[in-house]
Amino acid sequence: MEHEVAVSGGDSSLEEITGSSKLKPSKNTAIKCLKCDKVYIFPSDKDDCLAHLYMEHRLVIADVEDIALLEDYLQYWEKEFHTHEFEQYCTTMFLDQLPDGKYAKNEKYYLLCDILPQDYELRRRLKEKRLSEALERHQFELTDRTFSKECLFCRAIIKGLRADYLDHLFDKHFLLVGKPEKLVYVDELLDHLEENLNRLMCLYCEKIFRDRPTLKEHMRKKGHKRINPNRREYDKYFLINYNRVPTAPTPRKQHLQKRRRETASVSTVADPETGSVDFDKHFARPDSDGEHDSDWSDWAADGEPSSIKCLFCHHLGDNFTALKKHMHEVHRLDFEKATSSLNFYQRVKVVNYLRRQMCLLRCVTCDLQFDEEELLVEHMAQESHHGIGDKESWDKPEFFFPYIENDGLLCVLDDSGGDDPDVDTVRIISEDSLAQINKDAERLSLENFKLL
């Protein structure tokens, strides 16, 4: 392997490539091959272009997935290679095989990578440019009031802020796309989702259905009213991804990547009997070590959380019994007595309501707002307001969903007490089994909860 010193110059073209900034996201871009006259349309032809560079010109671009604004990167090097040969910029490698894998002796290949200072600087500037463009676009989308678009599910036309449109999707149709302050290129994202829905494709698992009602029922029952976070094409729509620094893969990750490459060719093969694709396997998380989800070795033996947080203070009970004793002795609340007439779903609502009130520094009984936690605790103690609140305050669908992550108290609530199968419930048939659930809960699914 050898590496030749790069030709000086090219700074002006580098400034030209990385200096401009665009407010709108780029659409289809025509990119010319770095060595011949063949033209590719990005981003749809990206893989074809890279394959062409390898098969026809034996050029490999290192860490191509980590290059920001790949179109600009290729345009820059197309100008450079128009007047210079690969050897002047690339690392030269000699391998004993042809591009198609057949054996051959001392075949020459070229590696374009950031070991070259000019390439390193180009990648750095493109990353800064991409971040700048994303932030500029993000600020525009948060404040622009000229937005207007028809809802993905109903005929309503939402005008004004894009945040209003996203709120409509969540409030009316329980579709959780993301928080406006964390999204960028929202218009493009919505167009992509609309295209998938028009193709009768599930937004999460991307299975195709015969008609729209069947698709909507599938997405509702399976909890698929959200985008799949494991699909890399959605990364560009989340602002957090624009400032991440790629890290060198560890030997373990390299081994896992090799395993995934070996199985990639078969992971998308359709089942001969059903004709369907195993999307769960194909789109498994990259950091998964290949083990099945049925590995429950780390599950607690007794099925109960190791500690449970008090509803009114920071005390952690060793178990549910100890926590109830603490609340009765310290806060004068007999939890069993206060919830004896409530069914399971109502108890879930009560717990989540109390969690929210305490997090917002609001009294659970009179809803009085405080600026400091100490003042709230003092008020509730003096006024004997350690209760569960009025039913009209907590009997709302929003309180079906946990307000704090991994709330151990929700795991130990039992079904004893005031459960009445004829009150406020409806019997439905799910895709897997017969289940009895509350009417309000039946309309919602867990992804509708807005994480704090």
Swiss-Prot record:
The keyword Cytoplasm applies. PROSITE patterns: ZINC_FINGER_C2H2_1, ZINC_FINGER_C2H2_2. One of its GO terms (biological process) is positive regulation of gene expression. SUPFAM superfamilies: beta-beta-alpha zinc fingers (SSF57667). A zinc finger (C2H2-type) spans 200-224, 361-385. Keywords: Cytoplasm, DNA-binding, Metal-binding, Nucleus, Repeat, Transcription, Zinc, Zinc-finger. Its main location: nucleus. It is found in: Nucleus; Cytoplasm. The keyword DNA damage does not apply. GO terms for cellular component: chromatin; cytoplasm; nucleus. Residues 248-271 are annotated as: Disordered. Interacts with components of the origin recognition complex (ORC) complex, Orc2 and Orc3, components of the SAGA transcription coactivator-HAT complex, Gcn5 and e(y)2, components of the mRNP biogenesis THO complex, thoc5 and e(y)2, and a component of the TFIID complex, TBP. Also interacts with polybromo, a component of the chromatin remodeling SWI/SNF complex. This is Zinc finger protein 277. It comes from Drosophila melanogaster (Fruit fly).
